[in-house]
Amino acid sequence: MVRVSTSEFRVGLRIEIDGQPYLILQNDFVKPGKGQAFNRIKVKNFLTGRVIERTFKSGESVETADVREQQMRFLYSDQEGATFMDDETFEQEMIFWDKIENIRQWLLEDTIYTLVLYNGNVIGVEPPIFMELTIAETAPGVRGDTASGRVLKPAVTNTGAKIMVPIFIEEGEVVKIDTRTGSYESRVSK
């Protein structure tokens, strides 16, 4: 692996601290009036998701983490996990639910997902930022609902995601959803 100096720290850089892969979320260079300059960074652990702050003296170096991303198509799921396929090599990768339970509600067959790999092992799966999903269940919008200030109602998508949608959305309609927040973005015209 390549070593990087504190002068090369930037947001988005993947580094290894104590044998664990981290993503730099924030980097502040501090030059006090007295003493040595240092970098105060906020990093997120790829394996646990925990965010911590670390301080490095100016000129120190750390190793970059062998974290890469690979685009793969979701094929199907079963009791054990989900199966993805590389569109170029047609290799299939089965990922157990314990690694991807947080995105289970966004799994839609024949959709491209980003698999995050560390030293060749899958450590996570990221869904597309926006997805178009069909509303499977929702209560009908009743005339006069807006008078009470209620403009959103609960709904369940065809993938099982529970979201809030405007009262004019009905079952069977396709909506665009932001998977980062789980929020409704817009109605998709057919």
From Swiss-Prot:
Pfam families cross-referenced by the UniProt entry: EFP, EFP_N, Elong-fact-P_C
Keywords on record: Cytoplasm, Elongation factor, Protein biosynthesis
Compartments in which it is found: Cytoplasm
Metabolic or biological pathway: Protein biosynthesis; polypeptide chain elongation
GO term, biological process aspect, one: peptide biosynthetic process
HAMAP family: EF_P
PANTHER family: ELONGATION FACTOR P (PTHR30053), ELONGATION FACTOR P (EF-P) FAMILY PROTEIN (PTHR30053:SF12)
Protein name per UniProt: Elongation factor P 2
Organism: Chlamydia caviae (strain ATCC VR-813 / DSM 19441 / 03DC25 / GPIC)
Source taxonomy: Bacteria, Pseudomonadati, Chlamydiota, Chlamydiia, Chlamydiales
